[in-house]
From Swiss-Prot:
Transmembrane segments: none annotated. The gene is metAS. The record marks S192 as: Important for substrate specificity. Its EC number is 2.3.1.46. This is Homoserine O-succinyltransferase. The active site is at C142 (acyl-thioester intermediate), H235 (proton acceptor), E237. InterPro entries: Class_I_gatase-like (IPR029062), HST_MetA (IPR005697), MetA_family (IPR033752).
Length: 315
């Protein structure tokens, strides 16, 4: 899917060099079709890196995707130039009157922080509640999935004894839903989190449909019956080197982390890691965009209202 982004956004140059179809504002102005409007709430410290990763995932379809970048507070980022944030990001007050086809809320390095201690927790609650009536489908990634379970279902934070880091096998539990169309019965996906998503706990306390689960990592992919909220507990958008950089960051910080599981050849951090989840990541985002966003969203977003009930898919 050609993604429509500002001409000067750093991701435009990077993705163009990768032969990914990027449509700048000037070119998109000559196409007389309505692009899908996707809002990205980027909570990750390295914002440019995350922008590139997610825009890469959104790029494989013949439709335009117009991406708006959202920031949640005015604190200066230690890892992203201030001028970049001021140039390309909007705050909630600037977009709250808009409606969107899709919303992606990223993870955040807050696994050991209680929700009430998160500086922007109240604003995040406001955004999630706002999305119910102003977004067709919202995709929550990693920490955002845990935060959404708290906001939408009242579930308290469940934390693992040690950080889960690595690439794990997952079993597809649902055959018919289009969100998992084309998934292998067993597939790999990366995780980097302290959050726990045990299947029994999720099943006992929510009405979510669970689509994929791992013996080591727990629930990986779930969604509400009306497809309006999608929960991904891992990081399918990660580049091949992202877990590597996080591992060395933790080493430098003296955390003494475990070597990411199933990641380095021979479990040797000196060897270049495999990117064994690439095809899965692209397929997950493509399915979400096509079936949960494009197929369900109204042409006139002003008519968007909260849907009720499930969707009868014809497979």
């Amino acid at each position: 899917m050609p993604i429509k982004i500002p001409d000067q956004l750093p991701a435009a140059g990077v993705l163009t060099e990768e032969n990914i179809f990027v449509m700048t504002d000037s070119r998109a102005a000559h196409q007389d079709i309505r692009p899908l409007k996707v809002l990205l709430l980027n909570l990750m410290p390295k914002k440019i890196e995350t922008e590139i990763q997610l825009m890469r995932m959104l790029s494989n379809s013949p439709l335009q995707v117009l991406v708006d970048l959202l920031r949640i507070d005015d604190r200066e980022s230690k890892n992203t130039p201030r001028i970049h944030v001021e140039t390309f990001y909007q705050d909630f007050d600037q977009i709250k009157d808009n409606k969107y086809d899709g919303l992606i809320i990223t993870g955040a390095p807050l696994g050991l922080v209680q929700f009430d201690d998160v500086v922007y927790w109240d604003t995040l609650i406001k955004i999630i509640e706002w999305s119910k009536k102003n977004v067709t489908s919202t995709l929550f990634l990693c920490w955002a999935a845990q935060a959404a379970l708290k906001v939408l279902y009242g579930l308290e934070k469940q934390t693992r004894g040690e950080k889960l880091s690595g690439v794990y096998y997952h079993h597809k539990l649902e055959q018919q839903d289009p969100l998992v169309r084309g998934f292998d019965d067993v597939f790999l996906a990366p995780h980097s989190r302290y959050a726990s998503f045990e299947g029994d706990f999720i099943r006992a306390n929510t009405d979510l449909r669970i689509f994929a689960e791992s013996e080591e990592a727990g629930v990986y992919l779930a969604a509400t019956k009306d497809c309006r909220q999608v929960f991904v507990t891992g990081h399918p958008e990660y580049d091949a080197e992202t877990l590597h950089h996080e591992y060395h960051r933790d080493l430098t910080a003296g955390i003494n982390p475990n070597v990411p599981a199933n990641y380095y050849p021979g479990n040797d951090p000196a060897r270049p890691p495999y990117h064994s989840w690439r095809s899965h990541g692209h397929l997950l985002f493509s399915n979400w965009l096509n079936y949960y966003v494009y197929q369900l969203t109204p042409y006139d977003l002003d008519t968007l209202d909260q849907k009720a009930g499930g969707v009868d898919w014809e497979i």
